[in-house]
């Protein structure tokens, strides 16, 4: 699943809209929307979630999704943000993403695990930023 949110004109692009998952119903919809709200609170991202379960793995689908997002970010000259698993962090840093000091907190009631946990959040600046880092 991949969820893209491109906001390069602020509120004019619907930045204040509520994330929803209209294709689900009942408890599944409620749980998914809670998860999206946790991600949404971190800020403006281009790529919120990318995964390639099962057969598509190791066929380059994830790389194609990342390349598309980086191309959009470069054309608009905006940073590209994404969350990661700890395992995926190596992949993103090899692509030039910088890990931010604050991650996305995922609530236990959303994932039904024992406690809240934090996912790393990364950013890749556009070429117009000229080696400027996000946090310093």
From Swiss-Prot:
Acyltransferase among keywords: yes
Highest taxon listed in the record's lineage: Eukaryota
Protein name listed in UniProt: Probable acyltransferase SID5
Pathway participation: Siderophore biosynthesis
Root EC class: transferase
MF GO annotations: acyltransferase activity
Lineage: Eukaryota, Fungi, Dikarya, Ascomycota, Pezizomycotina
Enzyme Commission code: 2.3.1.-
The keyword Acyltransferase belongs to this UniProt entry's keyword annotation: yes
